[in-house]
Each structure stands twice: as C-alpha cells, then as structure tokens.
C-alpha cells in the first residue's frame, strides 16, 4: 500500500503506511521486505522534503543493508544520488544527478543479479520521472 500511495503522489499516506510496517513485529522476519521498505522510506522522505532527516536515514539504511548483505549496486547508486541531491543548491545539479543515476541504472538493469530489484520498485522509471519533473 505504501508503494501504491508513493507512485500516486500521496506521500503523507505512503509515510503513514511505511511507519505502520516499521512498527510491525513481523517485518523483522522478512529481510527482503524490510530492505525494500527502508529504501522506499528514503524516497518518501526525499519527496516530502525531509532533507535533514534523510541524511540520518541514509546512514541507517546503508548500515542495515550492509549488515544483512543486501547492499547491492542498485541500492548504492540510488543512495549515492540521494546523498548528492540533498547537498545540491539548484535544480540543475539535481537534474544532472538524476540523469547520471538513470544511466547507471540502465547499465545495471542488464546485470542478472541487479535486475530482480525491479520486482519491488522500478528505480529507473522513478529517476526518469524525476528528470521530467525538474
């Protein structure tokens, strides 16, 4: 439901749903789902403009993904892009970072081990939509 609200632009509802998932005791038993939820949480906070909190969330997400051996190249590319964007001053830099992310994700899409990430969320399509918005 959180992904549904995010894709439709209802970021506050997406945040409410993702917070409900984080409060659930069952989320800890599904590492794949928790990793996806943490990545989606980063995107939600980016979209609602919580850039100060995003810096902390990025560090916590990277630590979690590395500890569970779920820190793949796709996640690294998205997180590195978000790190650069929250420090960016103008939209030109932000747009350039999203263009670089799209190119990197396009090349990663060909990798067998990285292509499965699109089952949970299509980061390439999201980055291309962000370029159009800017």
Which residues does each predicted region cover?
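Start-of-helix signal in alpha-solenoid helical-repeat scaffolds, especially tetratricopeptide repeats
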Residues: 33-36, 75
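Residue-level signature for tetratricopeptide repeat
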Residues: 4, 44-45
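Amphipathic alpha-helical segments of tetratricopeptide repeats
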Residues: 16-27, 60-70, 103-109
């Amino acid at each position: 439901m959180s992904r549904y609200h995010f894709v439709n632009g209802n970021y506050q509802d997406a945040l409410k749903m993702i917070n409900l998932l984080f409060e659930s005791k069952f989320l800890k038993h599904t590492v794949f789902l928790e990793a996806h939820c943490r990545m989606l949480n980063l995107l939600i906070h980016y979209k609602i403009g919580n850039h100060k909190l995003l810096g902390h969330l990025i560090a916590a997400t990277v630590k979690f993904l590395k500890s569970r051996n779920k820190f793949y190249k796709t996640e690294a590319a998205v997180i590195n892009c978000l790190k650069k964007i929250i420090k960016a001053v103008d939209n030109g830099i932000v747009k350039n970072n999203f263009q670089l992310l799209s190119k990197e994700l396009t090349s990663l899409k060909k990798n067998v081990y990285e292509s499965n990430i699109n089952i949970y969320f299509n980061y390439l399509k999201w980055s291309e939509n962000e370029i159009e918005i800017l």
